[in-house]
């Protein structure tokens, strides 16, 4: 057992310790930046210095640092985070690694994201649930393309708190001029991003300088150490203040006397007696009960998985939305969205894709690519396609009406994934900017031969369960 946890349990008792842990605020943050900027080392050092590393892990770390470490005689703290064999062999991060730690003040979930450009899609996945981003910059190399790319994607995904950690200051002798130059360059770039709270701190992740306490080696730095910034960062409560929204994940029908609608509350608070509207149908009813495994609730908050029963029998199925009558959720078949493209084959207009928005799955196609965004300069360029890791603003038409919110309003009902219809692989991630009126996705066009061949297959080989493409 971790010695810090053991001491706390001994002092408080197990029940009080668990109760105190339960009521601590939780901050989700990610580390991002270019390859070899020290993201995994930073997290490993934070875990170590906050006394969250178990004794057996520490012994393994000493052993692994001698065998495959990249830091000479010093402990390679990145090995605490990089778990894949390929990551350890190459000294890089590939997948998104999640780690948990806590301090007396707050709990934290960290997403350690990869720095290599080909893993940008993994970074976008890690950023999608975070409240804060730590942008790592190597003091020797300054602001690089991936630094800008990750900053832009984090901003695009709604993160409005950045801590810019200028790492490896020990390799530039903790030179204040180097720090000031990097700070100036980054803030000039970030001026083109949406309004963001940005703090800059000089650190040495390997040696632990300015992580938990202020370093004597940077007397010219008057700000807080990194961990204090994390403890004092604002935790998003915006969804709590919004009107209620919940995507229906499943209709629960265990017997003839019960019909409930299961899902996770995306925004707002709901109580028995509240009026809710069903989208896209627009029908209204009152909440009868809020059911959970542990019994009925008096109210449900964002993030809670519940089953809601209604006073009236209404046709509701998976993918529908339950919302408060005053929610500004739009029902549409046409959206404007920012999209991060995640596959080698370029995104092309007019090609049919599967679209999954919250719990609703539908089909659609790209009507137009309004522009592609240069992540280095934030300039907008004309484009006819999006390549791997490129970001663009697109108009999409859907075959079915869906309820959507702008991503900056509600993440869960404003984000979607694009799925390849043949391979079923996720190939893009989208953030809704706004609902557009007037267009719907038309039927897919097939030649006469394709229609006849499809009919022949369905007639003579019904066990293949081929779709009727004339209805697509």
Curated annotation (Swiss-Prot):
SUPFAM superfamilies: EF-Tu/eEF-1alpha/eIF2-gamma C-terminal domain, P-loop containing nucleoside triphosphate hydrolases, Translation proteins. The keyword Aminoacyl-tRNA synthetase does not apply. The keyword GTP-binding applies. It holds the Pfam family GTP_EFTU. PROSITE patterns: G_TR_1 (PS00301), G_TR_2 (PS51722). One of its GO terms (molecular function) is sulfate adenylyltransferase (ATP) activity. InterPro entries: CysN_GTP-bd, CysN_II, CysN_NoDQ_III, EFTu-like_2, G_TR_CS, GTP-eEF1A_C, P-loop_NTPase, Small_GTP-bd. Coiled coil: none annotated. It is an enzyme of class 2 (transferase). One of its GO terms (biological process) is hydrogen sulfide biosynthetic process. Residues 204-206 are annotated as: G5. Its EC number is 2.7.7.4. GTP binds at residues 33-40, 112-116, 167-170. Residues 24-240 form the tr-type G domain. Residues 112-115 are annotated as: G3. Keywords: ATP-binding, GTP-binding, Nucleotide-binding, Nucleotidyltransferase, Transferase. Pathway: Sulfur metabolism; hydrogen sulfide biosynthesis; sulfite from sulfate: step 1/3. Residues 91-95 are annotated as: G2. Residues 33-40 are annotated as: G1. It catalyses: sulfate + ATP + H(+) = adenosine 5'-phosphosulfate + diphosphate. Heterodimer composed of CysD, the smaller subunit, and CysN. With CysD forms the ATP sulfurylase (ATPS) that catalyzes the adenylation of sulfate producing adenosine 5'-phosphosulfate (APS) and diphosphate, the first enzymatic step in sulfur assimilation pathway. APS synthesis involves the formation of a high-energy phosphoric-sulfuric acid anhydride bond driven by GTP hydrolysis by CysN coupled to ATP hydrolysis by CysD. This is Sulfate adenylyltransferase subunit 1.
């Amino acid at each position: 057992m971790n010695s810090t946890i053991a001491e706390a349990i001994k002092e408080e008792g197990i029940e009080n310790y668990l109760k105190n842990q339960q009521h601590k605020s939780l901050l989700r943050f990610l580390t991002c930046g270019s390859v070899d900027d020290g993201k995994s080392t930073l997290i490993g050092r934070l875990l170590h210095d906050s006394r969250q590393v178990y004794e057996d892990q520490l012994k393994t770390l000493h052993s692994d640092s001698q065998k495959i470490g990249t830091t000479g005689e010093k402990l390679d703290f990145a090995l605490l985070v990089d778990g894949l064999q390929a990551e350890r062999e190459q000294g890089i991060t590939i997948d998104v690694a999640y780690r948990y730690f806590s301090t007396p003040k707050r709990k934290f979930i960290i997403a350690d994201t990869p720095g290599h450009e080909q893993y940008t899609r993994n970074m976008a996945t890690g950023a999608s649930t975070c409240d804060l981003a730590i942008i790592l910059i190597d003091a020797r190399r300054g602001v690089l393309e991936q630094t800008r790319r990750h900053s832009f994607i984090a901003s695009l995904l709604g993160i409005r708190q950045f801590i810019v950690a200028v790492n490896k200051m020990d390799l530039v002798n903790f030179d204040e001029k180097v720090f000031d130059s990097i700070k100036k360059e980054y803030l000039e770039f970030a001026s083109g991003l949406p309004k963001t709270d940005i703090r800059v701190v000089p650190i040495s992740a390997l040696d632990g300088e300015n992580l938990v306490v202020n370093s004597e080696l940077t007397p010219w730095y008057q700000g807080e150490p990194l961990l204090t910034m994390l403890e004092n960062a604002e935790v998003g409560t915006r969804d709590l203040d919004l009107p209620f929204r919940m995507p229906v994940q499943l209709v629960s029908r265990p017997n003839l006397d019960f019909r409930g609608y299961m899902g996770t509350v995306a925004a707002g608070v709901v109580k028995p007696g509240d009026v809710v509207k069903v989208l896209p149908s627009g029908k209204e009813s009152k909440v009868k009960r809020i059911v959970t495994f542990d019994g009925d609730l008096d109210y449900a908050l964002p993030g809670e998985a519940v089953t809601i029963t209604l006073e009236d029998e209404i046709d509701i199925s998976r993918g529908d939305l339950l919302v408060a009558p005053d929610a500004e959720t739009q029902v549409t078949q046409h959206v404007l969205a920012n999209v991060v493209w995640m596959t080698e084959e370029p995104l092309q207009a007019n090609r049919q894709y599967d679209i999954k928005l919250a719990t609703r799955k539908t089909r659609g196609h790209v009507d137009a690519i309004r522009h592609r965004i240069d992540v280095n300069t934030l300039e907008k360029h004309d484009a006819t396609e999006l390549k791997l890791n490129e970001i663009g603003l697109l108009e999409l038409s859907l075959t079915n009406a869906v309820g959507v919110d702008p991503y900056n309003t509600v993440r869960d009902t404003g984000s979607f994934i694009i799925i390849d219809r043949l391979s079923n692989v996720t190939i893009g991630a989208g953030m809704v900017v706004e609902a557009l009126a007037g267009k719907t996705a038309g039927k897919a066009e097939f030649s006469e031969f394709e229609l006849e061949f499809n009919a022949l297959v369905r007639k003579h080989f019904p066990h293949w369960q081929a779709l009727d493409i004339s209805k697509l």
